[in-house]
Amino acid sequence: MLKKLGLVDLHASIKQKIEDKTGLMAYDHVPEDMPSPFYFIEVVDKRPEDTKVMWCEVFTVWIHAIAEAGKSKIAIYDMIEKLEEALTEELVLPEEIDILRQSEVGMQSLQEDETGEMHAIVAYEIKVSYGFKVKI
C-alpha cells in the first residue's frame, strides 16, 4: 500500500514554517474580526504527476497575506517578502515522503479589500514523491 501525503500534514507543515519564520499567524480558517496582519493557507489543487519510475503528486497552495489597513503598500510588500524568504527552506514532511520541488508560481492577486486591508495571494507548487515503482 502507498502512503500518500495528507492535506492536513501538508497544511501543518506550511503553517509551522510560516509562523516560525515570519512571526505572524497562519490560518486555514480566519476567525471573524481577526486583526491583521496574518496569513491564510488554502490548498487549491492536487494532481498526480508520476514519472516512469516514481509515484508523484503536485499540490498547488495559495497563501493569502492580509496586511493592516493603510494608504501605503509597504506592509503588504514586506509580508510577501517574509513569506518568500520563509518558504525558501524545505518543508518538514513525514519521513517516507520526499519533496522534489517546492517553488513559487507567482503572485496571483494584489488588491485592497473592503476593510481597507491589502490582500495578496502568492501561489506555490509542491511536488512530492512517495517512492519508486517496482516491477515484479
Where are these regions (language model features)?
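Charged, amphipathic alpha-helical segments and their flanking helix caps
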Residues: 1-29, 43-136
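Short acidic/glycine-enriched loop/turn segments that link adjacent beta-strands
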Residues: 33-36, 116
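Low-complexity, acidic Ser/Thr/Pro/Gly-rich terminal tails and inter-domain linkers that flank the onset
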Residues: 36-44
